[in-house]
């Protein structure tokens, strides 16, 4: 099964594509869609077109996207929601089912701690996918969303579906910390 993860943003939208076979995770692609400094409609169109292109190029079976959190600034929240909507439209227009996860669910599923830092997310994604280098933070979040979805949103604290994947990499959890 191929999963496309999306980390929505108005300026930068991260994407990550993984293949899943049983408990095996395989990296396919990741990167970002950057929008031009232009009016809102142009930026949203760029996100929609970019996500639509990813769906055509990588032919995922499912998609997952991060849910919007309510920011202190309501205008920022509305703009992020619109960017997220453009990405979802690109996914749905490609016929994909779309799952949604909060940042807390994502961090807990990947790192085992809901308030994990960007650096901790990048490190765990790098280890889980056996990458030679760390992806950028937006791409790492998108890959994390795809991994979270691959394991049904299970958390490391319950050792849902990630325990076998960690064991294959020679890793395990000890008192909430990753050890090798």
Swiss-Prot record:
Binds 2 Mg(2+) ion per subunit. It catalyses: Endonucleolytic cleavage at a junction such as a reciprocal single-stranded crossover between two homologous DNA duplexes (Holliday junction). Its EC number is 3.1.21.10. Mg(2+) 2 binds at residue 66. Gene3D superfamilies: Ribonuclease H-like superfamily/Ribonuclease H (3.30.420.10). Mg(2+) 1 binds at residues 7, 138. One of its GO terms (molecular function) is DNA binding. InterPro entries: RNaseH-like_sf (IPR012337), RNaseH_sf (IPR036397), X-over_junc_endoDNase_Mg_BS (IPR020563), X-over_junc_endoDNase_RuvC (IPR002176). It is an enzyme of class 3 (hydrolase). It is found in: Cytoplasm. HAMAP family: RuvC. Homodimer which binds Holliday junction (HJ) DNA. The HJ becomes 2-fold symmetrical on binding to RuvC with unstacked arms; it has a different conformation from HJ DNA in complex with RuvA. In the full resolvosome a probable DNA-RuvA(4)-RuvB(12)-RuvC(2) complex forms which resolves the HJ. This is Crossover junction endodeoxyribonuclease RuvC. It comes from Burkholderia multivorans (strain ATCC 17616 / 249).
């Amino acid at each position: 099964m191929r999963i496309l993860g999306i980390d929505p943003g108005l300026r930068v939208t991260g994407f990550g594509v993984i293949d899943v076979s049983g408990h095996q995770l395989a990296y396919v692609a990741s990167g970002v869609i950057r929008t031009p400094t232009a009016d809102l409609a142009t930026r949203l169109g760029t996100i929609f077109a970019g996500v639509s292109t990813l769906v055509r190029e990588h032919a995922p079976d499912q998609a997952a996207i991060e849910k919007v959190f309510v920011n202190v600034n309501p205008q920022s929240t509305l703009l992020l929601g619109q960017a997220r909507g453009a990405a979802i439209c690109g996914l749905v227009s490609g016929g994909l089912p779309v799952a949604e996860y909060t940042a807390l669910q994502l961090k807990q599923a990947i790192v085992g701690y809901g308030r994990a830092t960007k650096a901790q997310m990048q490190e765990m994604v790098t280890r889980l996918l056996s990458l030679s280098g760390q992806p950028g933070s937006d791409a790492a979040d998108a890959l994390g969303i795809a991994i979270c979805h691959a394991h049904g949103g299970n958390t490391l604290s319950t050792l849902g579906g990630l325990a076998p994947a960690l064991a294959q990499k020679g890793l395990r959890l000890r008192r909430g910390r990753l050890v090798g």
